[in-house]
Amino acid sequence: MFDVIDFFCGCGGTSEGLKQAGMNILLGLDFDKDALETFAQNHPDAQVIHRDIREVSVDDLLRLIPGLAKKRRKRPLLFSACAPCQPFSKQNRQKSSDDRRISLLSECERFVVALEPDYILIENVPGIRSTSADEGPLDRFLSQLKALRYQEPVVQVLKAERFGVPQLRRRLIVMVAKNGRAVNELSETHGPGKENLVTVRDTIAKYPSLEAGQTDAIDALHRAASVSPLNLKRLRATPVNGGRLDWNADLRLSCHSKPGHTDVYGRMNWDRPAPTLTTRCVSVSNGRFAHPEQDRGISLREAAALQTFPEDFQFAGSTISIAKQIGNAVPPLLAKKIGENFTRHYREQNGKNKRRPKTKR
């Protein structure tokens, strides 16, 4: 079993998946109070730090978990560093090279130097590699790992739907080992010649019908955001698989005639994976986030399911906060498969998957 320190843990999507892969979550660190409360509810045995990572020292971690020190460790240690992705996202139109969040990944270096984790996982949007013409934060961090004699990093851009996640979501991951050979790349499990892609229908068709603004009587997370009377008219005018291009002129705004953002007010397609869920994934005016048939946006429960959170996962905060937590999260199913990949590497390096030699009779 691995021990895990989850920097920038958010609500705990990565930790949930790593836990499902058999790992032990020691600590989560995040600056978002609601997200950290969600993490704590779902990982009650883990320590939590509600502070900016720039204000956290190595000694702070060692005071909470003395066994982190390399000489005292009994199990392999994994650092997960999924730093905020907004500075690198294509959807961030106000990104700036001065955005202080860009430096957050480099903050992990001092923890790596002091504690020498056996494995490191980095997850972000693909744009983290193209922040500027100069060497970006990821390349700088990987150069630092090389200087610390870590193995060659495996850098992959994954399509989450090719790993069983019912959502089109491209993410860059980096997997690094301290000892032995490099970690293997992840192999896709879904798509042409493999298992079928998991669809919106497969994932959310089971949930009860709702009206906009309604909350299910049994499941409080299955609640749909309210919409204005005009937006309700727009939803009623949107056919299955349709969007705002299907409306009559009286329902359109002047901005709707401009190119781009054609997905807003669009319905999800029952028989395809969902579009990428964002921090506003329950708002019909912010993407193709309308229910495939019902005249409402998807509920928080449906959004969580499309991100592969289990039914018993508890969320803290307001509707806006929970939607943000869900949209920011690493899909637990994807994290589980990454965790299993690390575990295979460890077992192979330690001879636990090697065949025993045949004994002579």
Kindly give the residue locations of the regions a language model identified.
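S-adenosyl-L-methionine-dependent DNA methyltransferase catalytic core
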Residues: 2-5, 9-23, 147, 171-325, ...
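Short beta-strands and strand-loop turn motifs
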Residues: 119-125, 156, 316
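Conserved short loop/turn motifs at secondary-structure junctions
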Residues: 125-130, 322, 326
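Short glycine-biased active-site loop of nucleotidyltransferases that positions the nucleotide triphosphate
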Residues: 164-167
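Core alpha/beta nucleotide-donor-binding catalytic domains of modification enzymes
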Residues: 2-116, 126-130, 134-139, 146
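Conserved S-adenosyl-L-methionine
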Residues: 50-51, 150-162
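Short alpha-helical segments and helix-capping/turn motifs at coil-helix boundaries
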Residues: 61-64, 156-161, 260-262
